[in-house]
């Protein structure tokens, strides 16, 4: 009996290995991995800067489309804009799904977020509502909030410049609440910490294969006290933070609005536009979810972009001086104007913002798309439910398109006459995702950074820190290596350019 059972086991293993080899021959190239179920390339997967490893694998296997089996999760990595465009954009109807993460969606409560909603009717409804208000033209209605936040940031920096990172996070969050709900954000509001914690948890849990519960969903039923169920305890903390992040501002707005204590906002406008003959509960649920999108985008990605902008200005003072020369030509008697990114008289600043989103890839691998049915590309089989990663870092660091890609160089987008050179690929499109799942807040994020950057450089010289002898200290241009990328914390100095700075910024 034992011999028979042993024979069946051996036969099963042989069948698995042979069938795997046959199937593997039809898949895109990639590292071979270990031919054991739920193992595959698990031990090949990098913990830090995976975009660099994926690019190197592409070179090793002479391909721009890679296949890996990460512990049972099939993944395809696209290392060039050509493959990304062919699949995620031209075949967007089948490449627009999302990983239905048990950890992120169910346990951590991120099922409200457009970025993680399954492609379908609900996604279309919420995306349509959000995109209408935050289109390139639509964001103009929120310009006052962007300018106000930029001016208040200058005021804070004149008082406590050493807390610049906290001030940026606070003002971006305050702007998000103003735009989304028409309410204010108090100093040291616990909501801000909850938002930071929720986004921090998301960055950790978004890494495919990080938690076993995504491969084995039944693990979600384990009690939190069970040995090895640390993920349940983490999820509980992160979910409470996410719930507070979504619920608090909406409930505050609903409470204050009847008293006339809120300003016009995205949520208030959508509530007023509700179909009174329709399903009011459903409509309000959609409004609440999409209003939270304003903060989700600003709470992490825009903060990262602003921090990277400051880092670039410190590392490249010659760039800073050129931007300031443009700005000074528009400054009237030391007063800081309310800048508008549509101003054609500031081409160098606009080029600087383009370069910023290329130089600091906030999501180097973007959020993975999920293939909704089997597909064939270049003769390769890409199986249904494969997670498809766009290696944005590789696209934006392609030396054939952007020579010396590690260097922050706005001039690459300008012609000899100093005017925009439209023959150079605009990196901002790649920086905000691809196809039908690109970031719907792209226009708000770009204009926010543009306005804040212009305002800061009008008010301050951003300089390197100095040592005890007054000698400038060099700081490295280092970034974190997780799923979402941020500059590693650094010090700098904000030196007012005139004595009028604090008096000239009173806000609109």
Curated annotation (Swiss-Prot):
Record PROSITE patterns: CYTOCHROME_P450
Pathway: Secondary metabolite biosynthesis
Keyword terms: Heme, Iron, Metal-binding, Monooxygenase, Oxidoreductase, Signal
Pfam families, alphabetized: p450 (PF00067)
Function: Cytochrome P450 monooxygenase; part of the gene cluster that mediates the biosynthesis of psilocybin, a psychotropic tryptamine-derived natural product. The first step in the pathway is the decarboxylation of L-tryptophan to tryptamine by the decarboxylase psiD. 4-hydroxy-L-tryptophan is accepted as substrate by psiD as well. The cytochrome P450 monooxygenase psiH then converts tryptamine to 4-hydroxytryptamine. The kinase psiK catalyzes the 4-O-phosphorylation step by converting 4-hydroxytryptamine into norbaeocystin.
Biotechnology: The pharmaceutical interesting psilocybin as a treatment option against depression and anxiety is being investigated in advanced clinical trials.
Molecular function as annotated in GO: heme binding; iron ion binding; oxidoreductase activity, acting on paired donors, with incorporation or reduction of molecular oxygen; tryptamine 4-monooxygenase activity
Residues reported in the UniProt entry to bind heme: 439
Reaction(s) this enzyme catalyzes, per UniProt: tryptamine + AH2 + O2 = 4-hydroxytryptamine + A + H2O
Top enzyme class: oxidoreductase
Protein name: Tryptamine 4-monooxygenase
Cofactors demanded by this protein: heme
BP term (GO), one: psilocybin biosynthetic process
Signal peptide stretch: 1-19
Lineage of the species this protein comes from: Eukaryota, Fungi, Dikarya, Basidiomycota, Agaricomycotina
Organism this protein belongs to: Psilocybe cubensis
Annotated family: Belongs to the cytochrome P450 family.
Enzyme nomenclature, EC number: 1.14.99.59
